[in-house]
Amino acid sequence: EYFSSATQIGMTATPKADEGANNLDYFGEPVYTYSLLQGIQDGFLAPYRVTADFINVDLQGWTPDEGEIDLLGKEIEQKLYQRQNIGRDLAIKLRRKVVAHRITQMLYDIGRMTKTIVFCSDIEEAAEMRTLLINMNSDLCKKSPYYVTRIVGEDKEGKKQLDNFISVDEPYPVIVTTSELLSTGVDCKTCGLIVIDKEIGSMTEFKQIIGRGTRLRKDKGKWHLEILDFRNATAKFKDPSFDGDPEPVSYTH
């Protein structure tokens, strides 16, 4: 209200459309839009390629045996657990090992020093994913204890490595596991692989996550972005409100 008499200019990369916080309701239609697709075509942003990786338990769901107990000794409710429950309501250790293995496989394909962000369902899963990736990449972890690092709000040691991760000159950390912390406000110009292993509800959050890897740094060998998707989040690329198509998608099971 104080600035109501002034001309107000709004600029955003991910406009909000929440009830009570809708950019279009407040400012009206944008007077100028520069889309992600146009930025890629003009050579300012990195083109991206999607690998959609579907795990059997995600496709078929999982039902515990009658009387089956969890790691804490509590009986698991007998019902069909869908992909949306896994990670949030239910942790399947074998599934996490499969995810870590496939991340490692991709890094062997694209370069094991490719800076990578792994988005997990919560901070506990981010911690276990870090441990699994350390075990599967022990040779490089011997060279640096920060080859795989968890960066979450509650981990002070991990947060200390954030500046090193986003630096174009620091090689470590290489793989970062997180939940929410790195989805916004982090400019990691050399991030070459984004791994999605969490349910993403909103288009805004999806754009923010993809945006962590859309920077170009040709002088550092960053020409494009790889996206490894375990949660079918990249189906949002087909949404008419998303501006920018990926290169051909590959699917694995």
Walk through the language-model features, giving the residues of each.
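Conserved small/polar residues in nucleotide/adenosyl-binding loops
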Residues: 252-253
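Conserved C-terminal RecA-like helicase domain
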Residues: 82-176
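Short beta-turn/strand-loop junction motif enriched in small, turn-promoting residues
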Residues: 36, 105, 136-138, 181-183, ...
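Conserved RecA-like P-loop NTPase helicase motor core
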Residues: 151-248
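Interdomain helical connector at the RecA1-RecA2 junction of SF1/SF2 helicase-like NTPases
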Residues: 21-114
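Signature of the SF2 helicase/ATPase Hel1-core->accessory helical subdomain module
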Residues: 1-51, 57, 188, 193-208, ...
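Charged, alpha-helix-enriched surfaces in structured cytosolic catalytic cores
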Residues: 31, 35, 45, 94-98, ...
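Beta-sheet entry/capping signal
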Residues: 7-9, 47-48, 115-117, 147, ...
